[in-house]
Amino acid sequence: MVDKQPFVWVQVDGEEKLATVNLVPGNQVYNEKLVQMNGSEYRVWNPFRSKLAAAIMNGLEDFPFTEKSDILYLGVSTGTTISHISDIIGQSGIIFGIEHASRVARDFLDRVASHRKNIVPIIHAVSYTHLTLPTILLV
């Protein structure tokens, strides 16, 4: 069943699961289940790995992102939530995703940003605190 929201509910093993239309069909970010339905591929959005998914499942009233949104996302970690937001905003939107921890930043670059053209990764080294965000964006 498709809602008017930018996400959908899909049936998986007899249960309703939150999902987004996969912007990169065939690509998984965190080993999430892929579901084929109505000619589209959906990625199940795990609320135990994403606070935004948990908020939606608990009745979030004002969902802030739509197709074509422009977003600055601080602390992308390994990319679970940002990947689903990427699905939602589509090719017409853009996300500037910032991460400072080098290990998780590598995972984010390998698993997410390298596959999604609507994500601009910004890896901010905290050891360079004299650089501000505008400086980083201009480099």
Question: What residue ranges belong to the model's regions?
Answer:
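Conserved SAM-binding motif I beta-strand of class I
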Residues: 94-99
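Conserved alpha-helix/loop element of class I SAM-dependent methyltransferases that forms part
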Residues: 47-67
